[in-house]
Amino acid sequence: MPVFRAVLFDFFGTLTCSVQRGTAHRSTAELLGCPVDALVDVLDRSYYQRASGRFGDAVATLRWVCAQAGVHPPESALRAAVASRRRAVHADTRLRDDAVPVLTALRAAGVRTGLVSDCTHELPEFLPQLAVAPLLDVRVFSVQLGRCKPDPALYLSACGPLGLAPRDCLYVGDGGSQELTGARRAGMTAVRLAAPDLAGHMVFNAEPAWDGPELGSLSDVLDLVGPVALPACRPDATVGPVALPA
């Protein structure tokens, strides 16, 4: 019998490798007639406002960003830039090699899976194209809920559709947005993914003082749920439950 009945994952830096803005974002800036540095500055300082959907849909949000950067592109350019930005964020997204095997193993063991992500409009648009999409029983996006981590509403919004109490859920994240403290306060057990590639990860509002358990790889999640076997890459590995500190 699994120790936890569900595992909820952060997305960027957890199910994905470390994220940095790639060169594709330059195309978005060019479409808007905006210097790249000015665009990035507004994007960075407005992240939580945008991730909570404060400015409306993707076009309205980018229009607000442009105004803050001092440019006022026509509607056609805004719409083209929204599509360009979606492609750029998608291009920045590389799933971890063990993301699909881990989710597959959890579901095969009867453990529910979910996504709880602080994100802007792009992720809900392209997530259905990713291999992890059919392996997630519930998806909670801050931009749709109107709240960001560490607000307990995000975590509890995942519990409801699963029909589970927070204590039945394990939360896994890299620690951005104070998400681990938020999950713990919501009544979940939280663990930090401390994979080596995250040293250069683009993160907002990290929690370096996290004193809870950490994992070196996403596959280590299975050691906390057990007994679960990871398919293909670890065919003989069946692990038992591991006790976590309260």
Regions found by a protein language model. Give the residues of each.
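Asp-based, Mg2+/Mn2+-dependent phosphohydrolase catalytic module
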Residues: 1-9, 31-34, 76, 100, ...
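N-terminal helical cap/lid subdomain that shapes the substrate entry/recognition surface
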Residues: 1-101, 109, 121, 125
